[in-house]
């Protein structure tokens, strides 16, 4: 019942379905049962949750035995992460599957929405469920893979915006999965799709697994290419934003924007899940490496312009991985802070969504706008940073706008660079 699972449960309950959510965190469950949003930033969640909790249409528990037996459908939205060697770590997902399977009763549909390497639903989880439950897939229960395709902060809108992909282990199981999602979801009309928006059967779990990995890996590869263009543009004194704008003026070019980091639970992780099945995919691995190096590159640009960062006061603006979302998963802040520490800078971090104590929990000193600083590096595109001026950062000698969110007109007379801006001001 996290940032994806809770909105999903709320959406189902708002559609008239009886929903029980399971999570290992009792504090989160207590908040949900009390109608209190456990985490900020999800549009409409604070509005939708209270009446559902008070009516009992949605309730939360830490006990699988209180939720799984007799369920028509079980939707798994448990995190799958990568370890220090960038290999999929199935520990949490395996444990959740075992706990669920121990209470599974005949007739239930099990849908995995967590992004998985190709072949995992059929090769790992269907056999595991059979082993623990003693039931037989395709006879006593059905398993499908149906990837979540939503973005935190706008889950309710995204559920209606994008087709729901469903892949089963057999034809009848897939049909059942399609019927389930047609019953719990509704869709926006879109004339830009090759077929009507709605639930799209994929002909197998593997196709659905690959579709999710392919769409997210494409984004990482595209951003990696944009970042490569940006680094060359910096070296050549070219504004890459104008180049990309020109390229994208014809229909065959869709170059993404370069930036200081690619963060979040999805885009930095899912290429690794793809590579788990296709380790020879050199384009994918090269793009992932290029994107992972961008925080250090941004710091190196500052060091090159100033001669050295040794002893300088540097404020990193933005702990979150993206603007407006209180989440640090794979945020570029970690790479930026690490590179600054290696350069000998005095580092502090600012984020409008985090308190001083929350920043301190990461081991960072908090920076407050208005305090003296030598260098500022924008890492997250928070809306409040768009209006930043040198007056907000007294003494600033250089702004590295890693997200290109500030207005150049507000920085006239103070050195400001962007990723791929091709600018080399005198500091």
Residue ranges of each PLM-predicted region?
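Structural/interface elements that position substrates and couple domains in central-metabolism enzymes
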Residues: 1-427
